[in-house]
Amino acid sequence: MARSADRSAEDGDSRAGIRELSLEEVLKSYEQPINEEQAWAVCFQCCGDLRAPRPQPHPRRPELQIRDPASIILHRDGRVTALLQSCDDSNAGCESAADGKLVQSLGVAIYRALDWGLDDSEERELSPQLEQLIEFMVGGPDCGQSKHCGSNAAKDEGYSGQDEEEEEEEEEEEEGAGRGIHTVQQVMTMCASRLANPVLAPEHYQAVCRALFLETLELQTFLSRIRDAKEMLKKIRKEEPQEDSAAELDALQHTDWARLWVQLMKELRQGVKLKKVEEQPFNPLPTEFSLTPFEMLMQDIRLRKYKLRKVVVDGNIPTCVKRNAHELILDFIRSRPPLKPVSERSLPPPPQRPQSLHDRVLAEIRQDHKLRPVELPSSKRSFGSLPCLAHTCQCDIKSTSCIDLSVTGAGSRPSSRIRVLLKAPTLAEMEEMNIFEDEDSPDGVDMRRVESSPTPLKRDRSFSEHDLDELRGEMMSDSPQHSGVAALRAERPRSHTLTGVYQASFPGFERRSASTCRSLSSDDRSSDPGGDSASHGLSRHQWMEEFCHPVETLALTVDGVINVRRILVKAEMEKYMQNKELFSNLKKGKVCVSLSYMIDISPTAQ
């Protein structure tokens, strides 16, 4: 059994590789003649192959012709070729006679294929068009000449009459038709003229020949499997008792199987219809021969040309068929566990993309420029945690109203001049300033004198009186140096006077400040371990007395800033006194003028 299966598989593979079959093999496989549509297709395709240019026969060489159906070869793609063989007949020597002989031999081969398997006493009935084509192809030019001679003889006898004239006209028409069909091109024209659209004749006849080739291969595969099954049954029959089914299968011969196959193909073509005629567009070409029954069935399935019947179980349609597909999908979704809400889902952070060169350049542009720190050489001495003091030395002034003295001498930082942006006061504030001015100056000093006189500065309270008493106690302990310190203290100006604010107006203060600065520097330089105790104690008391009273003349309070701003605003308002309307609007607050001044709060700002 395995051997038979292997052999059938090998036969199927070998037949799948077959590319051509002769017309005689096709007839032997079916054991019956071909149909008319297949005859038209074989004739047309064979004439198309014979129409190709061939070497012209030499007058002394024998002509070529088609002997039998075995000389007609069918190919898998629907082409048909002819194997030409030499003919000993040398009656015709021109090209037209050679074509006529070739057409005549083709007609004889086609007629034998149509008459295959019939007895000599039987004759197949053909359609008028096909019968006329076969007669003209087989008759050749001799038929027309004989008829022409017979008509001439009848004319010579001198018979006349209306009936005889009509018969002569019909004979002339048939004679003209018989004389015209002597070439392959004329046969192809006649084969194409029978179709509704002659232009589609090559495609239609090629499809018919291709279907004939494929059906023959399928039949041969089927017959080979039947043969293998018979052999297998014979082996089984030898081992087991004979059964009726095996006897019936044995009775069926090769011809019977072939007829059953042909009958099945016919029923598939004509009996089984999956489509309605009115739903299909009219196609004049007989498509039932262009495709195999299996290809027709697959084409109908692909195009959905069928109507499905309702499935009934126990007389009722099942519930799964009644329900809508959408409802089934919803039920399936509901049966699944509930999904997590989107708000509760936590997605991982997106991967950080590498920063492009353009973004890097923009980031560097947006960043502040880092300036290189510059250390200035300074011989200043750190004063520990003493209160904020302003340098009175002209050479070391860095325009700061408050200096941090807790920094060590080695790491002294460069001080920068602090500039404060003061906004212009409103009219209400200006009125309040005027009231305060009247209270401060009851004698009615004029505006110019107020502008020239500075505001007295208050004492810095960061250095308490208790610290001052302690310093004085230490100074009183040393009596020899006390007189010098007292003299130095007597020379010190009062803290609430106006001499420390504007140094440019009082040169004496400037000289004293420079001398004080020099005394401090000399005190630093003279502090060596080899000096005498008296000079050391004197310098120490001088230093303590110098810084007992912090820089009261250099500290600018808020009241002083307000006074300066008030003076500046009044000076600015004097510009608009000529325009009374504008001045009144400014005073009432209807018009606002933005006044901004940069005031340098330092001893050298003046």
Swiss-Prot record:
Annotated region described as Disordered, given as residue ranges: 147-181, 438-464, 517-537
N-terminal signal peptide: none
Superkingdom as given in the UniProt entry: Eukaryota
Biased composition (Basic and acidic residues): 445-464
Residue ranges of every copy of the KIND domain listed in the record: 21-219
Keywords carried by this UniProt record: Actin-binding, Cell membrane, Cytoplasm, Cytoplasmic vesicle, Cytoskeleton, Membrane, Protein transport, Repeat, Transport
Location of region: Spir-box: 554-574
An example Gene Ontology biological process: cleavage furrow formation
Pfam short name (any one): KIND
GO (cellular component) term, any one: plasma membrane
Function as written in the Swiss-Prot or TrEMBL entry: Acts as an actin nucleation factor, remains associated with the slow-growing pointed end of the new filament. Involved in intracellular vesicle transport along actin fibers, providing a novel link between actin cytoskeleton dynamics and intracellular transport. Required for asymmetric spindle positioning and asymmetric cell division during oocyte meiosis. Required for normal formation of the cleavage furrow and for polar body extrusion during female germ cell meiosis.
Domains: entry comment: Binds to actin monomers via the WH2 domain.
Protein name (record): Protein spire homolog 2
Organism from which the protein derives: Danio rerio
